[in-house]
Design a protein with these regions (language model features):
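Periplasmic/extracellular loop-to-transmembrane helix junction in inner-membrane transport proteins
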Residues: 2-16, 41-51, 67-70, 78-81, ...
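Membrane-interfacial helix termini and adjacent extracytoplasmic/periplasmic loops
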Residues: 11, 39-44, 159-179, 237-271, ...
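Cytoplasmic-entry segments and transmembrane alpha-helices of multi-pass inner-membrane transporters
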Residues: 14-16, 202-241, 408
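Flexible loop/hinge segments at secondary-structure junctions
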Residues: 47-165
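Transmembrane alpha-helices
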Residues: 279, 288, 302-338
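C-terminal transmembrane helix and the adjacent membrane-cytosol boundary/short C-terminal tail
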Residues: 281, 285, 289, 296, ...
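Interhelical loop and adjacent transmembrane-helix boundary motif
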Residues: 337-386
């Protein structure tokens, strides 16, 4: 009786420990997801203008609606007249004013007033804007006081539409960060698609050979090598790509630089091969022997049996292997960062440098001020990556469940 009660006690204890650890893990994952999306969504309630600054114009200026990209072009002197911004009744050219060059526009008396009391800056800036009807100014918000009589432009908040449709990623731009993630999303999809197109034929061929054609000696040699490939750190693949693949691409295609989307796709294809080969091989080995023998008995040869029986029967498992390979490619960071050129521009071909979501987060998160628009935008990118990988995993679960139902 004592033995039974003791055994029951230890079983209950271990069961409780397992339940507790599972609960803690689940709660931690949920909290991480909540933190990720709460930090990300806070971007869309943030002002576009850099924190602590204001954009000012003459009080008679009719400008009302201006985008963040237009403001950047104004301060970069790419837009030089108010007509280009839709202010039809304003013939003035745009003059850019920053607080650093206040001495250029202020009189000696005004500079003395500022030196005596910094609170006089608002009055001086008002006078400068009054005398220069075409001026646009970026000044610290705390300099706008009761003496300021001109107009402040309200740029509004970051919008979801602009975030996903703009094609410029320049989060450190002043006075307004440029947070268009379209180039980064497209770079991620291009590299991942290229990787799967390269990895699928080689991975499927290797899995067919190992499952259907190889003898036991060759199989015992190949299996550990493939498993070893999956255990190599991604930075090692990155070094291999940087030393071997990048110079090769530069030489073959006569490019100014070899860091490109194609280099990233080749490296990711090599990294995805172990996943595709292993899962596809397991799926091919699950084909009932009776089906193969029936095919051979009807006069089909070995290759006809593989193409007409084995592959169609195991297509769900092969599809799951491909999708998991895509998931590996989408989430990879270091290897891609090393070989793609890390350029946040819209890719036109795989021979151009580009940037992916994981590489962007890894390269910029350490430099982004906590709580700023740049920091929050990186969390939005993390949320996008999470949703992409979640959808991939759900699709794999769906395919796997279909395969299990079919085998029953």
């Amino acid at each position: 009786m004592k033995m039974k009660s003791r055994k029951y006690f230890w079983e209950s204890l271990w069961e409780g420990i397992l339940k507790l650890s599972g609960s803690v893990t689940s709660i931690a994952i949920i909290l991480i997801i909540i933190f990720l999306f709460s930090e990300g969504f806070s971007l869309f309630s943030s002002k576009k203008i850099e924190d602590g600054y204001s954009i000012l114009v003459n009080k008679n200026n009719k400008i009302e609606d201006v985008s963040s990209s237009e403001i950047k072009k104004v301060f970069d002197m790419e837009i030089v007249s108010w007509k280009e911004l839709g202010v039809d009744n304003n013939e003035d050219e745009i003059t850019v004013f920053r607080i650093d060059n206040i001495e250029t526009y202020a009189t000696e008396e005004e500079m003395i007033l500022i030196e005596e009391d910094v609170a006089n800056v608002g009055k001086v800036i008002s006078r400068i804007l009054e005398d220069n009807s075409g001026m646009i100014a970026q000044v610290p918000k705390d300099m706008i006081n009761k003496d300021f009589t001109q107009k402040e432009i309200d740029l509004g908040h970051f919008s979801i539409r602009e975030f996903f449709t703009l094609k410029e990623w320049f989060p450190t731009a002043l006075p307004v960060p440029q947070l268009g993630v379209m180039p980064i999303i497209m770079g991620t999809l291009w590299v991942s698609l290229g990787a799967i197109l390269l990895a699928l034929p080689f991975g499927l061929a290797a899995s067919i050979y190992m499952a259907e054609l190889s003898n036991s000696k060759v199989y015992r040699f190949m299996k550990p090598i493939i498993e070893l490939l999956s255990g190599i750190p991604s930075v090692v693949y990155g070094f291999f790509g940087l030393i071997v693949i990048v110079p090769m691409i530069q030489k073959i295609f006569n490019l100014p630089v070899g860091e490109s989307g194609l280099a990233g796709s080749i490296v990711l294809a090599i990294m995805a091969l172990p996943t595709i080969i292993t899962i596809s091989e397991d799926a091919l080995r699950s084909v009932p022997r009776a089906m193969k023998e029936a095919s051979l008995a009807l006069g089909a040869n070995k290759w006809q049996t593989i193409l007409k029986v084995s592959i169609p029967y195991s297509i769900s498992g092969i599809t799951a292997a491909v999708v998991l390979g895509i998931g590996r490619a989408i989430g990879e960071t270091m290897a891609v960062l090393m070989v793609t050129g890390n350029a946040a521009v819209m890719p036109k071909t795989l021979l151009e440098p580009l940037r992916t979501i994981p590489a962007t987060i890894a390269a910029e998160l350490g430099e982004a001020p906590a709580g700023g628009a740049h920091y929050q935008a990186l969390f939005v990118l993390g949320g996008i990556l999470f949703i992409m990988t979640l959808l991939i995993n759900l699709f794999v679960e769906y395919i796997s469940s279909k395969n299990k139902y079919k085998t029953k």
